């Protein structure tokens, strides 16, 4: 709401009419360009924070399984068949 009021007041000022069309367009393009850069930086910062939080939560969940190890034993063991003594 406030930016709209400021823009409206700037358009009412006599000096703003002296700019002409191309200069006003360049100013608006520069504002839009800076706005895009700021939004891109904020988006990248948010993605990095989410990724760090995800990695931290995975490390916490991996702590549950630290005591569990697979056995060094094959699934199928060979039977040791001994001949009965005669």
Swiss-Prot record:
Entries under InterPro entries matching the protein: CD3_zeta/IgE_Fc_rcpt_gamma, FCER1G, Phos_immunorcpt_sig_ITAM
Tissues where the protein occurs: Expressed in leukocytes and pinealocytes. Expression in the pineal gland does not undergo circadian variations.
UniProt keyword terms in alphabetical order: Cell membrane, Disulfide bond, IgE-binding protein, Immunity, Innate immunity, Membrane, Phosphoprotein, Receptor, Signal, Transmembrane, Transmembrane helix
Phosphotyrosine, modified sites: 65, 76
Pfam family, one: ITAM
Regions of this protein lying in the Cytoplasmic compartment: 45-86
Topology, Extracellular side: 19-23
Signal sequence annotation: 1-18
Annotated Gene Ontology cellular component terms: cell surface; external side of plasma membrane; Fc-epsilon receptor I complex; Fc-gamma receptor III complex; plasma membrane
GO biological process: antigen processing and presentation of exogenous peptide antigen via MHC class I; antigen processing and presentation of exogenous peptide antigen via MHC class II; cell surface receptor signaling pathway; cellular response to low-density lipoprotein particle stimulus; defense response to bacterium; Fc receptor mediated stimulatory signaling pathway; Fc-epsilon receptor signaling pathway; Fc-gamma receptor signaling pathway
Transmembrane segments: 24-44
Main location: membrane
Subcellular location, record wording: Cell membrane
MF terms in GO: identical protein binding; IgE binding; IgE receptor activity; IgG binding; protein heterodimerization activity; protein homodimerization activity
Physiological role: Adapter protein containing an immunoreceptor tyrosine-based activation motif (ITAM) that transduces activation signals from various immunoreceptors. As a component of the high-affinity immunoglobulin E (IgE) receptor, mediates allergic inflammatory signaling in mast cells. As a constitutive component of interleukin-3 receptor complex, selectively mediates interleukin 4/IL4 production by basophils priming T-cells toward effector T-helper 2 subset. Associates with pattern recognition receptors CLEC4D and CLEC4E to form a functional signaling complex in myeloid cells.
Protein family according to the UniProt entry: Belongs to the CD3Z/FCER1G family.
Self-association state and partner proteins as the record states: IgE Fc receptor is a tetramer of an alpha chain, a beta chain, and two disulfide linked gamma chains. Associates with FCGR1A to form a functional receptor complex. The signaling subunit of immunoglobulin gamma (IgG) Fc receptor complex. As a homodimer or a heterodimer of CD247 and FCER1G, associates with the ligand binding subunit FCGR3A to form a functional receptor complex. Associates with CLEC6A. Interacts with CLEC4E. Interacts (via ITAM domain) with SYK (via SH2 domains); activates SYK, enabling integrin-mediated activation of neutrophils and macrophages.
Name of this protein: High affinity immunoglobulin epsilon receptor subunit gamma
Organism, as annotated: Rattus norvegicus
Name of encoding gene: Fcer1g
């Amino acid at each position: 709401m406030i930016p709209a009021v400021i823009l409206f007041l700037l358009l009412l000022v006599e000096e703003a009419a002296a700019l002409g069309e191309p200069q006003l367009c360049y100013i608006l393009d520069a504002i839009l360009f800076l706005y895009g850069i700021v939004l891109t930086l904020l988006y990248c910062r948010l993605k990095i924070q989410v990724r760090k939080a995800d990695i931290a939560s995975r490390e916490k969940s991996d702590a549950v399984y630290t005591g569990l190890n697979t056995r060094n034993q094959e699934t199928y063991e060979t039977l040791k068949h001994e001949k009965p003594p005669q």
